[in-house]
Amino acid sequence: MFREAREQNKKLILGLIHLRPMPGTPYYIDGDYEKSIKKAVFDAKALENGGAAGCLIQTVDKVYPSGDDTDYVRVACMSIIASEVRKNVGQDFKIGVQIMWNCITPSLAVAKSVNGDFTRCTALVGTTTSPFGTLEADPLKVFEYRKKIETESVDMIAEIAGYHFKSGYDEDTLLGLVQSANMIGASAVEIMHRDEEINNQMEAAIRASFPHMPIVLGGGTDVASAKSRLRNADAALVGRCFEDGNWGSGINEKTVAAYMKEVNSI
């Protein structure tokens, strides 16, 4: 998916669908699950109609495990939600799933159940901090499970600098993480820096050393900055912008269309 887009010089724009808290989590209230289904379908259609390439369905439970495993009910409910999205969009619309904070193997299981296209991995390589504890990558476990359930076709984005993977910006550290991600077979690397100049420097450094590695921007773009920030990147995950600045609310189809107009002019 991501490598094909890079080879074809396409920009994949993927909207974030932020769900309500899942059953079995501390902040779940009765009705949240049903609201999540309706919201996911609505947001996916808004993205599709606005011209985005796909979506990333993401749990928003407020409190998360720091390890890779999670409660069965989160996996089951996420599978149903993603399945409902799959039923309501065209076959070319890309669907990604991410059970936060770093539940990679459960996310792969969901992707398997709905013929999903990709997942996003907070810590596929390296070590990072989070509000919920230290995250230690375990790529051997991930790739053994991926092979076991035959999800090699599910692309995996490795976060190496951004919202969830905290590494700052040191070029040697950054490129070391790209090297690790490339070595184990990540489909793309994700970066994000709020300072656009630094963000573009990071893109340039990766592109110079790893010209074939797809780069995903993990945030920080809006309609005004999409063209300049995406010039050297291959894809973007877009959340708050498509929600008109109201994080976690519904996606505005018109905003998606305006963003895509800028991207298509690159």
Enumerate the predicted regions with their spans.
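Glycine-rich, aromatic-flanked loop segments that form ligand/cofactor-binding clefts
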Residues: 2-19
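Short beta-strand elements of ligand-binding domains
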Residues: 96-99, 216-218
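A charged, well-structured terminal subsegment
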Residues: 248-250
